[in-house]
């Protein structure tokens, strides 16, 4: 399932009738239920599942999966990632990007210095941060760079098709 994106994880069992806690990775936790079908990793393969219900419980969310009717059935699914097909995600306005689209992009300075490749992103209070794995032959001996994702000030240009991000950044940092 190459065109999928993980949007959450099944948590602990709730009750005796097969309900499971849901850890949502979406901005609005309840919006995870806007996507159907879900896919979960089961015995090394993605398996499509259907929900028969969900509800808020205390400060979290719980769901009921079709065919999962006992605590034991639910226990087998705890910790499973929840994925949806990426074409189900809403289109973003120009200049906004899903993190998954930025991971793997080459990062180059405005002066042409190859900084490395985006390996992940981190969310901070003020802005997201690109984690860039430096090239093996990095002249500054860097292994990893943390570059703030500040549009126009640091991030000068993003070309998702070419998998390239141009930044105004000192290679020594």
Swiss-Prot record:
One of its GO terms (molecular function) is ribosome binding. It is found in: Cytoplasm. GO terms for biological process: ribosomal small subunit biogenesis; rRNA processing. Gene3D superfamilies: PRC-barrel domain, RimM. GO terms for cellular component: cytoplasm; ribosome. Belongs to the RimM family. The PRC barrel domain binds ribosomal protein uS19. Binds ribosomal protein uS19. An accessory protein needed during the final step in the assembly of 30S ribosomal subunit, possibly for assembly of the head region. Essential for efficient processing of 16S rRNA. May be needed both before and after RbfA during the maturation of 16S rRNA. It has affinity for free ribosomal 30S subunits but not for 70S ribosomes. This is Ribosome maturation factor RimM. It comes from Tolumonas auensis (strain DSM 9187 / NBRC 110442 / TA 4). The lineage of its organism: Bacteria, Pseudomonadati, Pseudomonadota, Gammaproteobacteria, Aeromonadales.
